[in-house]
């Protein structure tokens, strides 16, 4: 009996290995035409990444593309997993410009325990329906109301910066921690309509849970040792993730239930109008309110549906904005002439009274600040790598891409290609001035918010928040970089772009 069972299991194992071998051999044969670095058995190119410090990943991707790619296309094997890196805007347009490649790459699975099937990771009909529902949340009338929240968060940020200015003086301090708490405050209030006061209570359970889950996501997505669920679930990191997820999900769920009950009591549970004249006009609405008053196929969204999207909004609008702001202040601190122009524009538009709120209309008049933000996002895109999964064999501009391939597109690499941007390592905000520049920009060469149908739905929100915080900081302080400005920061391209070492700044109060 046991011999029979053993024979059956051995046969099944043999058949499974044979099928896997044939599938793997097919991949190798189909992609044999594409250039790539020399490979090792079993690990492929994994030895270039396993056990190496995170900042080496950026160098390695640039090195591979510059050394081995042909027409800006390159294959990279991570074990049996085939990845194709693309750096040609024409190829990028095919991948991002249609819904043919709508599925995110496998690395995004690490987000599912927190975001479930929120807009970032959902696909197909569910993604299309949710996108349609969420779009009105970024209508200009609602964005106008969010500026009040940005103003409040900026005031708390200035208070903390002043404390550090007095405490550290010329030695400087890291702006990132305060900026990160500021964006957490603003995103939480705009998403859920509640204040968590992260800037005054950084040790709260919710704030710590957000920090924990961000750390977990970085490690899971870019450490091959945490990629496999069976082994990952046995690690202390998995236990920390579970604890943090319980805090985050319970907090969001509680707010959803409370707000749904409030709307019922107010008699306002009808579907909100999407008409331009009505959206956001009646009351200050949080992102949560839009979802609570929305329907899919004439049915209201469940609490789980809403939690997925609120958590996604929290995730997408928190660390990304912090990263953009940190690199913005680095750029203008190391380019005093640009900082001077930003300050003069802000003072000209907003006036000399530092207590004057910076309104939506005023923010839209900050044209040079806008150019500096765009140039910062070219050099330091908050999301340095985008991924798509190929579900069936296809051709992209004559190149055969087999089913099962992960396509990698790096906004960071695209933004530093000399063929696309003159002097790509130089901070030149004027290159984005469509009135004065002769430089013609391929729309798929500059993709800090991705591009196409799955572009970042909140990019106008993000730009508005960045400019609001910048305007408030620069009219109060002159920002100087503490360090060697001749050496660019060493970058770590994880889920969100960051630096190997914290960027340190000192600030001087502006008197006028």
Swiss-Prot record:
Residues reported in the UniProt entry to bind heme: 316, 456
Record InterPro entries: Cyt_P450 (IPR001128), Cyt_P450_CS (IPR017972), Cyt_P450_E_grp-I (IPR002401), Cyt_P450_sf (IPR036396), Cytochrome_P450_Monoox (IPR050196)
Annotated EC: 1.14.-.-
Gene Ontology annotations for the cellular component aspect, listed alphabetically: endoplasmic reticulum membrane
CC cofactor: heme
Protein location: Endoplasmic reticulum membrane; Microsome membrane
Pfam families listed in its UniProt record: p450
Record key words, sorted: Endoplasmic reticulum, Heme, Iron, Membrane, Metal-binding, Microsome, Monooxygenase, Oxidoreductase
PROSITE patterns: CYTOCHROME_P450
Stored CDD domains: CYP4 (cd20628)
Record-level Gene Ontology MF annotations: heme binding; iron ion binding; monooxygenase activity; oxidoreductase activity, acting on paired donors, with incorporation or reduction of molecular oxygen
Catalytic EC class: oxidoreductase
Function: Involved in the metabolism of insect hormones and in the breakdown of synthetic insecticides.
Similarity-based family: Belongs to the cytochrome P450 family.
Name assigned to this protein: Cytochrome P450 4d1
Organism: Drosophila melanogaster (Fruit fly)
